[in-house]
From Swiss-Prot:
SUPFAM superfamilies: Adenine nucleotide alpha hydrolases-like. ATP binds at S25, G26, G27, P28, D29, S30. Transmembrane segments: none annotated. The N-terminal region contains the highly conserved SGGXDS motif, predicted to be a P-loop motif involved in ATP binding. This is tRNA(Ile)-lysidine synthase. It is found in: Cytoplasm. Ligates lysine onto the cytidine present at position 34 of the AUA codon-specific tRNA(Ile) that contains the anticodon CAU, in an ATP-dependent manner. Cytidine is converted to lysidine, thus changing the amino acid specificity of the tRNA from methionine to isoleucine. One of its GO terms (molecular function) is tRNA(Ile)-lysidine synthase activity. Its main location: cytoplasm. It comes from Lactobacillus gasseri (strain ATCC 33323 / DSM 20243 / BCRC 14619 / CIP 102991 / JCM 1131 / KCTC 3163 / NCIMB 11718 / NCTC 13722 / AM63). GO terms for biological process: tRNA modification. The keyword Manganese does not apply. GO terms for cellular component: cytoplasm. It comes from the Bacteria.
Amino acid sequence: MTEFTNFFTKNNIEIKNKKFLLAASGGPDSVALFHMLVNFLPNPSKQLIVAHLDHCLRKDSYLESELLQKLTTAFKIKLIEKSWPVALHPQTGIEAKAREFRYAFLAHTGKKYQVDYLLTAHHGDDLIENILLKFIRSGDVAEMNSLQIVGNLDSMRLLRPLIKYSKDQLLEYDKRNGLDYIEDETNFEDDTLRNRLRHYVVPLLKKETNHLVENAYRFSESAALLSDCQNSFFESLILPIDFGKALRGKKSDLINLNENQLAAFFDYLVYKKWHQRVHFDEIRRRKKATFNKENFQLIFYQDYYYLINRNGLTPIDSKKKKIKLDEKFSLNGKEYLISHDKKIGNLVGYFYGVRTDFLEVGSLPQGSKLRLADGRQTKAKKKFAENGIPLILRPYCLTIWQKENPVYVENVYQNQEYNANFVRYNVYIYL
């Protein structure tokens, strides 16, 4: 128990009057953690809640529920249970979907019962497997360190207090304390890469050193420190701004970054904004204007760079529609309001035109022209280029018409005709 109690001291985890939610499966690891907690917390019957999700992947999964009911009843601990309906099981990627459903259940339970800490029974062998798995799949140090020792899930702090324990140590703990548990038979199969690493690779590595768990923990701490340093450096830079369907920044803000830093910076931006790991390694090898990586696109255009999540690009509504002033309306996945008055919201532009209560809005068709102050017309694509708007984003720029003439194009153009009777229209966006 010394290593267990040290975890809370080292990480400044307050215990008194705090609520703990244990994600339990009925396996040897979570049973050991349950037993440690009921012997560690000052008032476990009031401080501890156990959450169990039956994934409905095995016929005998009901045995886990029976065991947890027996354990929690014996110690007067609240047990919350839920099943993952078979109808929701996907044909592919079931592990990822199961994890997603499980953490949604835990987040909901934590919020409902105002929990302070969520605990999982991940241990040192899990950490080793995770490092090897992510090394094989990506080689990204940030991904290899994805099993954080202390993290967050919604409003709860996520704790993994068994991370310095090996699997063998936990099995010995269960045996010494006479604890029953359920073995998941699928863990003994070789159908997944994680299981093959567990059965064949990790045992070989353990033969080479008695400090494998300790070394994995040290690697995790070192990787976390390096990641924090890198993130602090990137946060010190001038960061891009939200630009409708993209992030937009100035190329001049990147001039002090070398190619490796540049690639890492864009990886960082994608993860910060969309919580996906991508690698713009191609920046290191090729000089070009557009880079595509999975569902993301990086564009260098004129004086700007753009990061676009193409999954967030909604179908273009090509038809004009009539809207009323001072009433919110949606267009191409964005919400706007146009008013003569000042409103609460993000003012993205304004224009002057004849007074009316109704306007036409939509996307500017290709080939359109815009009227200049001297009465001549210019091609809209020229104005888009002057303002550094790439082709893929142009249809998402709000256009407003009066009397069939464009009087406003978001981030590009405002009516240049003058008339003493014109009034000002303010354009607000609500993201």
